[in-house]
């Protein structure tokens, strides 16, 4: 694939930076491929001597590529730059976000988080499709009674509603749907 060809160019002792054309193309291609595969997350993880790219599809992580460390580090820097994160800081977790478009031209938001590991910086990108975010409460699994209770809680003039749950459980989707 073109991704493998782009990564091939990245082999050898050459150093890359976040604005290198090859790196820009690799990141763009990776995102488009993730959208095509209907991935919900993209993981870029350092190992002892190479980088691993994994996609979460239907809740399961699949290894997609192995890439040279120099390419992986430059990709991570490129994505951090786009997410307005501190590119230099690699020893502390960071969060950011990037808006981009699918091949069909629809806007998608990526939530970024980095985490230091023994072998370098791990980057996880969660893909948010605004089309998927706005649904109705019934399609989110709310019973009729729950819908009524939720409506009452979220339209009260004062108070606080705390929405918690594990990653991917639908917190953001529930809140977007409520605001709609």
Over which residues does each language-model region extend?
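N-terminal "pre-motor" subdomain/linker immediately upstream of P-loop NTPase catalytic cores
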Residues: 1-166
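Conserved glycine(s) of the Walker
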Residues: 170
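Hydrophobic positions on the alpha1 helix immediately C-terminal to the Walker A/P-loop
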Residues: 174-178
């Amino acid at each position: 694939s073109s991704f493998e060809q782009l990564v091939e160019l990245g082999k050898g002792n050459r150093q890359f930076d976040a604005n290198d054309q090859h790196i820009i193309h690799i990141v763009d291609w990776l995102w488009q491929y993730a959208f095509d595969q209907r991935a919900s997350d993209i993981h870029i993880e350092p190992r002892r001597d190479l980088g691993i790219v994994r996609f979460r599809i239907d809740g399961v992580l699949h290894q997609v590529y192995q890439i040279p460390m120099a390419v992986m580090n430059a990709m991570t820097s490129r994505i951090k730059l786009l997410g307005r994160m501190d590119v230099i800081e690699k020893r502390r977790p960071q969060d950011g976000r990037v808006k981009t478009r699918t091949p069909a031209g629809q806007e998608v938001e990526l939530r970024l988080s980095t985490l230091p590991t023994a072998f370098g910086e791990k980057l996880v990108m969660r893909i948010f499709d605004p089309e998927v975010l706005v649904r109705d409460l019934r399609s989110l699994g709310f019973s009729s009674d729950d819908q009524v209770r939720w409506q009452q809680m979220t339209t009260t003039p004062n108070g606080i509603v705390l929405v918690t749950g594990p990653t991917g459980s639908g917190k953001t989707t529930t809140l977007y749907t409520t605001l709609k």
